[in-house]
């Protein structure tokens, strides 16, 4: 029987409930106890994403959450890069249509800007950066990218963000099951990238993972 109470605690530094669910599934088996901001007394705490890159924002958020909570924190920043839009929305993906815009608003803006652009020129990628920090110290980062094409309409209900217009083969990312998405997504690849750093950090705390996590390429 594993004594879960003795596991190292890591704060999930995000207010996005969809990211909480995905990161929880992707980090399962590492031998750590994931803590939500609400469970750490951080209701309403958010970090201004003032960095000019996804890497800068992921580090900024991990460091800020770790400092505020007084415990290690893991944070993600992700973005959609559309080649025909010069890499936009990129680091501004969440704020692309304004601070108070919905996912539907952001999707509509991207599709309007791509109106008339042929499918062969609608190449895009999702990029994710994950950072692990202790209070006052960055432990490490991981990155992940997945390539696709922007469709001409929203499809599927399983995803969030820009997932409904991001096509991987003949399906949008929002048409994938959660298990399928977690096996192929940019965030899963970022977790795989940072996994050795997490394992080394956990080992230094005297803990090892519960089981092996499938590798992703």
Label the predicted regions.
Residues 2-11, 17-37, 41-217:
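Anionic-ligand binding patches
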């Amino acid at each position: 029987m594993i004594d879960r109470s003795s596991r190292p605690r890591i704060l999930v530094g995000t207010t996005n409930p969809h990211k909480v669910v995905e990161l929880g599934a992707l980090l399962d088996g590492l031998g750590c106890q994931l803590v939500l901001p609400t469970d750490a007394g951080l209701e309403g705490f958010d970090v201004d994403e003032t960095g000019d890159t996804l890497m800068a924002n992921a580090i900024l958020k991990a460091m800020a959450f770790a400092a505020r909570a007084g415990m290690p924190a893991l944070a993600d920043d992700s973005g959609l890069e559309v080649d025909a839009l010069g890499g936009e929305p990129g680091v501004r993906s969440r704020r692309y249509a304004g601070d108070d815009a919905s996912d539907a608003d952001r999707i509509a803006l991207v599709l309007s800007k791509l109106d008339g652009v042929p499918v062969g020129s609608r190449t895009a990628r999702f990029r994710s950066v994950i950072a692990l920090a202790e209070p006052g110290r960055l432990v490490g980062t991981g990155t992940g990218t997945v390539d696709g094409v922007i469709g001409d309409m929203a499809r599927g209900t399983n995803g969030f963000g820009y997932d409904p217009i991001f096509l991987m083969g003949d399906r949008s990312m929002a048409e994938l099951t959660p298990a399928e998405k977690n096996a192929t997504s940019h965030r899963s690849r970022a977790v795989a990238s940072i996994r050795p750093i997490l394992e080394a950090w956990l080992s230094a705390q005297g803990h090892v993972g519960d089981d092996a996590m499938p590798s992703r390429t």
